[in-house]
């Protein structure tokens, strides 16, 4: 949860944030998280959380 909050403070870095969250939170066991699609797509956002 802390990781989500930390990266959510950088609106301009949405794409990078998507990459990071996917890699550190779900990259080890799934390409998609339980709350959001972590694929690093343009305009990606964690608002789905």
UniProtKB/Swiss-Prot annotation:
Localization in the cell: Secreted
Tissue occurrence: Milk.
Highest rank taxon of the organism: Eukaryota
Coiled-coil annotated spans: none
Keyword set, alphabetical order: Antioxidant, Antiviral defense, Endonuclease, Glycoprotein, Hydrolase, Nuclease, Protein synthesis inhibitor, Secreted
EC category: hydrolase
EC number: 3.1.27.-
GO molecular function, one term: endonuclease activity
One GO BP: defense response to virus
GO cellular component terms listed in the entry, alphabetical order: extracellular region
Protein modification: Glycosylated.
Similarity comment: family membership: Belongs to the pancreatic ribonuclease family.
Function, as annotated: Manifests poly C-specific RNase activity toward yeast tRNA, elicits a dose-dependent inhibition of cell-free translation, inhibits formation of superoxide ions in vitro and inhibits the hemagglutinating activities of soybean lectin and Ricinus communis agglutinin 120. Inhibits HIV-1 reverse transcriptase.
Protein name as annotated: Glycolactin
Originating organism: Bos taurus
